[in-house]
UniProtKB/Swiss-Prot annotation:
The keyword Cell inner membrane does not apply. It comes from Mus musculus (Mouse). Keywords: Activator, Cyclin, Nucleus, Phosphoprotein, Repressor, Transcription, Transcription regulation. Residues 272-283 have a biased composition (Polar residues). GO terms for biological process: G0 to G1 transition; negative regulation of Notch signaling pathway; positive regulation of transcription by RNA polymerase II. This is Cyclin-C. Residues 252-283 are annotated as: Disordered. Its main location: nucleus. Residues 20-151 form the Cyclin N-terminal domain. Component of the Mediator complex, a coactivator involved in regulated gene transcription of nearly all RNA polymerase II-dependent genes. Mediator functions as a bridge to convey information from gene-specific regulatory proteins to the basal RNA polymerase II transcription machinery. Mediator is recruited to promoters by direct interactions with regulatory proteins and serves as a scaffold for the assembly of a functional preinitiation complex with RNA polymerase II and the general transcription factors. The lineage of its organism: Eukaryota, Metazoa, Chordata, Craniata, Vertebrata.
């Protein structure tokens, strides 16, 4: 783990400007509304979470995989690489970077196939069409895009420090931790430093648990306007999420999503440089 966030590639290269992020997204917003794009974000975060849990990965590994996924599509259209392939690729890479240990090829493909069939069959009625050669090639493109900047800082550690400083660990930590997990369904991890996200989640937890922490927050040397911006995004997430029926909506949204060329049959697959350019698009 790099010692200082302010000197890290996370801060120097991967805290993005919101307007630049929206500009990069315009290609996809020709096919999807902003609300549909947001629902895709929630959905694929759920896929990564379910896959990570199936593989018994730590939450930090799952969070890192989610950040990798978001970084890729912050720079490229959904059409460039199928998100159904990118999701397990991000899990595969994150498990190595976070020193959890390499998930074996067979186990990764079996887990992805099982999770999509049992948890997300309403969205993916067909078998998972990719094999390990696709994952490895996708990993190459992901590494290239991130320029091998693989260390990701998360809000979990600062959150622990803050609740301990408050002396409210038992009351606030479980709820604030869950709120941090939920923020990965938004763009917040691309836009704000993790310590600010931690403070915003803690603030929301204090309000929900009716803990008066105004004095504690007032003593912080932090831009509270930015904390309030993050809180507004969190509240908007919960407001929209409660009206989102994944089972009814996702098949239609996925059908509208811009896609690369169709995947090949499992026999005689070829990568993006072969005659069957399955999961990648150069456009």
């Amino acid at each position: 783990m790099a010692g200082n966030f302010w000197q890290s590639s996370h801060y120097l290269q991967w805290i993005l400007d919101k307007q630049d992020l929206l500009k990069e997204r315009q290609k996809d917003l020709k096919f999807l509304s902003e609300e549909e794009y947001w629902k895709l974000q929630i959905f694929f975060t759920n896929v990564i979470q379910a896959l990570g849990e199936h593989l018994k990965l730590r939450q930090q590994v799952i969070a890192t995989a989610t950040v990798y996924f978001k970084r890729f599509y912050a720079r490229y259209s959904l059409k460039s690489i199928d998100p159904v392939l990118m999701a397990p690729t991000c899990v595969f890479l994150a498990s190595k970077v976070e020193e959890f240990g390499v998930v074996s090829n067979t186990r990764l493909i079996a887990a992805t196939t099982s999770v999509l069939k049992t948890r997300f069959s309403y969205a993916f009625p067909k078998e998972f069409p990719y094999r390990m050669n696709h994952i490895l090639e996708c990993e190459f493109y992901l590494l290239e895009l991130m320029d091998c900047c693989l260390i990701v800082y998360h809000p979990y550690r600062p959150l622990l420090q803050y609740v301990q400083d408050m002396g409210q660990e038992d009351v606030l930590l479980p709820l604030a931790w869950r709120i941090v997990n939920d923020t990965y369904r938004t763009d917040l991890c691309l836009l704000y430093p993790p310590f600010m996200i931690a403070l915003a989640c803690l603030h929301v937890a204090c309000v929900v648990q009716q803990k008066d922490a105004r004095q504690w927050f007032a003593e912080l040397s932090v831009d509270m306007e930015k904390i309030l911006e993050i809180i507004r995004v969190i509240l908007k997430l919960y407001e929209q999420w409660k009206n989102f029926d994944e089972r009814k909506e996702m098949a239609t949204i996925l059908s509208k999503m811009p896609k690369p060329k169709p995947p090949p049959n499992s026999e005689g697959e070829q990568g993006p440089n072969g005659s069957q350019n399955s999961s990648y698009s150069q456009s």
